């Protein structure tokens, strides 16, 4: 009897699908976070595969800060219409009423109120006991030490010094009422794996990932896309057209573009093979305070 040898990507795919199915079977009310980025697109594709030909048996949740790229929101709505999944959106209305934004309140306060607090509001409102996220261990040092099943207490806080063991891919999903698990089925994937899988599976992604001529403003040494008229121009700043793309996506004032000629998947993969810089170097929220990401995760951020 011939033994089937799985490729590297097939092994990653099988592991992720097993995790997704396990959560769907084990938890009462799971949800999949949908940030609209490349990792979310891969995770959505894996969820569709996991339950094909049936529909995904849990909703997708997008925390809308009001500052996402316009192309991201258009892509989100198009994907929901195309695949027919249940899409929930949530915005922190208190933050909206207070006029909280990245330009007026800074990245740390904006992220806390419009992302972290909004996420906790949505999880509490719907009573979700498990939430899938597209984080990978190779992205950032605090994520590198987080478990696939990441326990959160009643306040959605993460304690990196009190994590559950995960031996032989055996995951502990036991929670009391009010507690929850954040689940990361892409934990063992790398950025290059993600791009190669997108290429292999022909997965649709937001066009912002591809290099194109775009209007940007240089702020603090970073190229910020002028996505709408809410961006203030400081003295000496001017809008200019540059050929850029994004390696990661978030709120447009807090996500820097990079110069690139990679306007196809093949060119992006070639660029990834040569790059020596961090994927998240363009995410301003990662450097707005000391140990920034770990601090945010302790407070309930994904």
From Swiss-Prot:
Pathway: Sulfur metabolism; hydrogen sulfide biosynthesis; sulfite from sulfate: step 1/3. The keyword Nucleotidyltransferase applies. GO terms for biological process: hydrogen sulfide biosynthetic process; sulfate assimilation. Keywords: ATP-binding, Nucleotide-binding, Nucleotidyltransferase, Transferase. GO terms for molecular function: ATP binding; sulfate adenylyltransferase (ATP) activity. Its EC number is 2.7.7.4. It catalyses: sulfate + ATP + H(+) = adenosine 5'-phosphosulfate + diphosphate. It comes from the Bacteria. Residues 280-302 are annotated as: Disordered. The keyword Nucleotide-binding applies. InterPro entries: PAPS_reduct_dom, Rossmann-like_a/b/a_fold, SO4_adenylTrfase_ssu, Sulfate_adenylyltrnsfr_sub2. Heterodimer composed of CysD, the smaller subunit, and CysN. With CysN forms the ATP sulfurylase (ATPS) that catalyzes the adenylation of sulfate producing adenosine 5'-phosphosulfate (APS) and diphosphate, the first enzymatic step in sulfur assimilation pathway. APS synthesis involves the formation of a high-energy phosphoric-sulfuric acid anhydride bond driven by GTP hydrolysis by CysN coupled to ATP hydrolysis by CysD. Belongs to the PAPS reductase family. CysD subfamily. This is Sulfate adenylyltransferase subunit 2. The gene is cysD.
């Amino acid at each position: 009897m011939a033994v089937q040898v799985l490729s590297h990507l097939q092994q990653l795919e099988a592991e992720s699908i097993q995790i997704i199915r396990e959560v769907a079977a084990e938890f009462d009310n799971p949800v999949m976070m949908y940030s609209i980025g490349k990792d979310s697109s891969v995770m959505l594709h894996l969820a569709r595969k996991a339950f094909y030909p049936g529909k995904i048996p849990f909703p997708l949740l997008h925390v809308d800060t009001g500052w996402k790229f316009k192309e991201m929101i258009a892509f989100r709505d198009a994907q929901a219409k195309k695949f027919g999944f249940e899409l929930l959106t949530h915005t922190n209305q208190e933050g909206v009423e207070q006029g909280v934004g990245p330009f007026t309140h800074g990245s740390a306060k904006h992220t806390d109120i419009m992302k972290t607090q909004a996420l906790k509001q949505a999880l509490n409102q719907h009573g979700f006991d498990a939430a899938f996220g597209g984080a990978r261990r190779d992205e950032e040092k605090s994520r590198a030490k987080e478990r696939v099943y990441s326990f959160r207490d009643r306040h959605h806080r993460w304690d990196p010094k009190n994590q559950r063991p995960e031996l032989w891919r055996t995951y502990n999903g036991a929670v009391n009422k009010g507690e929850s698990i954040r689940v990361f089925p892409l934990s063992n994937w790398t950025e290059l794996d993600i791009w190669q899988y997108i290429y292999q599976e022909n997965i649709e992604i937001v066009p912002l990932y591809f290099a194109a001529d775009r209007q940007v403003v240089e702020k603090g040494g970073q190229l910020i896309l002028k996505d709408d008229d809410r961006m203030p121009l400081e003295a000496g700043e001017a809008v200019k057209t540059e050929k850029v793309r994004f390696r990661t996506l978030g709120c447009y004032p807090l996500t820097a573009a990079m110069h690139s000629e990679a306007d196809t998947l093949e060119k992006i993969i070639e660029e990834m093979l040569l790059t020596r810089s961090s994927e998240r170097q363009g995410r301003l929220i990662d450097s707005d305070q000391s140990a920034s990401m770990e601090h945010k995760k302790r407070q309930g951020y994904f």
